[in-house]
Amino acid sequence: MNYLIERRQEEKERRRVEILDAAEATAREVGIGAMTMDQVARKARLSRALLYVYFQDKDDLLFGLCNRALDILEQRFIEAVGRHKLGIDQVEACGRAYIAFAQEFPVYAESLAAFEAHSVEQLATEGNVGACVIAGDRVHAVLIAAITRGMADGSVRPDAGPPPLVSFTLWGFLHGVLQLATNKAAILAHGGTTTQQLLEQALLQGTRSIATRR
């Protein structure tokens, strides 16, 4: 009996992964905004009814993609932090890792933007939304640890603020700049600025705002 239950669970997880793969492929083709559940069902070669067994609506599906994105981003942050000794350098490395992640995985970056657009009142503690909250906490924990380390080693100002607050502020700042770089490239170019210049300036200002020396 346990064997059958295990097999069913494995099959359920395999199907869920296939649906997320199909959603990711569809989003690359048409964009997350234009993506529909019908398109994902066709890409996954499933009926709409079966798709809704796994994901209750498009938002739920996006949260599934967001959870994938955060798992990857957490690993990128861990790798980035591991290459530096000083806390402030770890913070900057996380910023660069976030930018590289957004450029390498635009669908995941878009799913994170959709997640950030949901208000706190809409966030649950279970299902795909809850998984995203937990995964997001893990990502922030890496950045918080880097900020805390910087305060201990003297590279981050002790009066910069509580590390969790600093982490959320830096995240919000860079997330907003990334949205500008993604959606307003033509306007930036009109003003004589490239997206890369904007991103480098954001990293410079973000780290300088909390560094003891730069």
Per-range role (PLM):
Residues 1-30, 34-43, 60-63:
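Basic, helix-initiating cap at the start of DNA-binding domains
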Residues 103-145, 164-165, 192:
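Short secondary-structure transition hinges
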Residues 62-69, 112:
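Alpha-helical DNA-contacting segments of helix-turn-helix folds
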Residues 109-110, 129, 151-202, 213-214:
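Hydrophobic/aromatic-rich alpha-helical bundle segments in the mid-to-C-terminal region
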Residues 64, 78-108, 130, 163-170:
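Hydrophobic alpha-helical connector segments
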Residues 45-55:
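Short hydrophobic/aromatic patch on the recognition helix
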